[in-house]
């Protein structure tokens, strides 16, 4: 579309999306977003301040409008240029080869598990140790009762002190 044939008033009535559609149609190749914005500003005669004020809405409109497609790397084109199968291929990012890490030596030898024959004597010693550990735990639990008895005595002492305090308060109130 030749914009020279339009008067400045007619150009001001054109939306930015209409201008981009005709610019991309004339170019017939994908263009970066920044280049599109510069061309719109040139065609419509917009100042940099006006462009900055409208750029967010323009980008939103460009994304929403079904006639345009983002081809990655901030390049835009017309959807009609690309068959559906080709669109998927262009949008997908190219896989980057992964860098191989150097294997660091941890200073340990790799241990290969083998079936080892265990003696029955080793197993019974471990069981004896487990029984002794269990006996220690049970003894410790018996000692916990002593701690509870101490807490009960502390509660009793506190209750007696509280009772004495209450009686002292009552006597002071009676004196007044």
From Swiss-Prot:
This is Probable DNA-directed RNA polymerase subunit delta. It comes from the Bacteria. The keyword Transcription applies. InterPro entries: Asxl_HARE-HTH (IPR007759), RNAP_delta_N_dom_sf (IPR038087), RpoE (IPR029757). Residues 106-176 have a biased composition (Acidic residues). The gene is rpoE. RNAP is composed of a core of 2 alpha, a beta and a beta' subunits. The core is associated with a delta subunit and one of several sigma factors. The keyword Ion transport does not apply. Disulfide bonds: none annotated. Participates in both the initiation and recycling phases of transcription. In the presence of the delta subunit, RNAP displays an increased specificity of transcription, a decreased affinity for nucleic acids, and an increased efficiency of RNA synthesis because of enhanced recycling. GO terms for cellular component: DNA-directed RNA polymerase complex. Residues 90-176 are annotated as: Disordered.
């Amino acid at each position: 579309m030749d914009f020279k044939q339009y008067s400045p008033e007619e150009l001001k009535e054109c939306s930015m999306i209409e201008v981009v559609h005709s610019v991309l149609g004339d170019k017939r190749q994908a263009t970066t977003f920044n280049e599109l914005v510069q061309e719109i500003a040139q065609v419509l005669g917009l100042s940099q301040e006006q462009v900055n004020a409208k750029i967010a809405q323009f980008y939103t409109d460009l994304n929403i409008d079904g006639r345009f497609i983002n081809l990655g790397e901030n390049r835009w084109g017309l959807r009609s240029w690309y068959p559906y199968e080709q669109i998927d291929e262009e949008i997908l990012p190219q896989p980057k080869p992964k860098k191989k890490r150097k294997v660091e030596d941890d200073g340990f030898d790799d241990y290969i598990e083998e079936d080892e024959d265990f003696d029955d004597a080793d197993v019974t010693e471990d069981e004896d140790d487990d029984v002794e550990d269990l006996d220690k735990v049970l003894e410790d639990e018996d000692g916990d009762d002593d701690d509870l008895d101490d807490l009960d005595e502390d509660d009793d002492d506190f209750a007696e002190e509280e009772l004495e305090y209450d009686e002292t308060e009552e006597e002071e109130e009676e004196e007044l």
